[in-house]
A protein has these predicted regions:
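Glycine-biased, small-residue-rich flexible motifs in mid-sequence functional cores and linkers
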Residues: 3, 9-16, 86, 94-381
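Short, small/acidic-rich helices and loops at N termini and domain boundaries
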Residues: 5-99, 285, 367-369, 374-381
Length: 381
């Protein structure tokens, strides 16, 4: 495909138009600004169609930024980005896309666009984010391998999310691969490049085994240290739980744990001996009540409310759950006429907004009332 083949308002993917991507390339807007504008106007197309006065007075943009949108800035760069991504087999997903991960969508500082290489469905599996020090000890590696292995044995559709860095990240990804679980790497580099370069082979193994590599960075991004900090928020938001396997008194994994806590995620930590410097951080998280103590995979399963395979039995529901909210009852009622429904069908059936539906679906999954199937369809349990 050449640039001339791409037009404005064209759906470059089923749920995404060129305008979604173009907002990223407007100087002074970026991902955070794009999220704000789309939330305000309803869609990226509506942002570009908005009059200058609305952009300034209603959305609060500076006049020069409004002018860039009115002039169609970012469109040509977006066209080139589509060509680049198709050349490298990279999927582009906007925050309004049905394939955008539900836990990430509820974060206020979510990326407006994700670039995904590999299996997009991996982002919607039963995910656990695992982080820790880059100087992981042999004991920390063994613990990571044991916990991930036991989880993979006990839980269907397990996906381990981590950051592709040295140390605990690499140990988590490799443990998932060794035990037949899916794993997703979130990188602070422009795809298809992998940092560190020593983990390129690991990335290939992840992709070969049904996982994915994720970045929020378009191909024109200039590398800088702040990108790694920003990457951590994606790791924290992608899962309902975050496990810190080993950390010294300071470090990036503790920052990620803080971010996860701010998102309302379940933060967990593995304790270590009081003389082990690589456990000072995790021990302190537990001591201060900022993380739940993890001694086994069973603790993780219990803290996240997961149901292990051994306890999964067909059940006949006699009465409706009294804890269901009215929107949740509407969602479940929609399955009376169809065995499976996708995101758009549920919006049509319930009249809920995208944000409302995302939150209610997550609650219903946690309650065990519905489950997500391959292909982004839901079924009632």
């Amino acid at each position: 495909m050449c640039i001339a083949d791409i037009t404005r308002n064209a759906h470059i993917y089923p749920y995404m138009t060129l305008e979604d991507l173009a907002l990223l390339f407007i100087r002074g807007i970026g991902s955070r600004g794009a999220v704000h504008l789309v939330d305000h106007f309803g869609s990226a197309e509506d942002v570009y169609a908005a009059p200058r006065s609305a952009l300034i007075n209603d959305a609060g943009l500076r006049p020069e930024l409004a002018e860039r949108i009115v002039n169609g800035d970012g469109m040509h760069a977006a066209e080139a980005e589509v060509v680049y991504c198709r050349k490298h087999d990279i999927r582009i997903i906007s925050a309004t896309d049905a394939e955008y991960p539900l836990p990430l969508r509820e974060a206020s500082d979510r990326p407006h666009v994700l670039f995904v290489k590999g299996n997009v469905d991996a982002l919607s599996m039963r995910t656990l984010s695992v982080v820790g020090t880059r100087e992981i000890s042999p004991s920390g590696k063994d613990t990571t391998n044991r916990l991930v292995g036991d989880l993979a044995t006990a839980i269907d559709d397990l996906c381990i999310v981590s950051g592709m860095a040295y140390g605990a990240d690499g140990a988590a990804h490799r443990a998932a691969l060794a035990h037949g679980a899916t794993t997703v790497g979130v990188v602070a580099s422009v795809l298809p490049e992998i940092t560190p370069t020593a983990h390129r082979a690991l990335a290939e193994d992840i992709l070969r085994n049904g996982g994915a590599i994720v970045s929020e960075l378009h191909s024109q991004t200039k590398q800088n240290g702040a990108l790694f900090i920003a990457r951590n928020r994606i790791i924290a938001a992608l899962s309902m739980g975050l496990l810190v396997v080993e950390s010294p008194a300071t470090g990036g994994s503790l920052s990620t744990a803080e971010i996860a806590d701010s998102y309302g995620r379940v933060v967990m930590a593995v304790p270590g001996r009081m003389t082990d410097s690589t456990s000072f951080g995790t021990n302190n998280l537990i001591r201060c009540g900022k993380a739940r103590l993890i001694l086994s995979a069973s603790d993780i399963i219990e803290d996240l409310g997961w149901v292990p395979k051994s306890k999964q039995q067909p059940q006949i529901k006699v009465t409706e759950d009294d804890t269901l909210t009215p929107p949740q009852r509407m969602i479940l009622s929609a399955f009376d006429t169809a065995s499976t429904l996708d995101y758009d069908e549920l919006i049509t059936a319930t009249g809920l907004t995208m944000g409302e539906l995302a939150m209610e679906l997550m609650e219903l999954e946690l309650k065990g009332s519905i489950r997500l199937l391959p292909g982004k369809r839901y079924e009632r349990v």
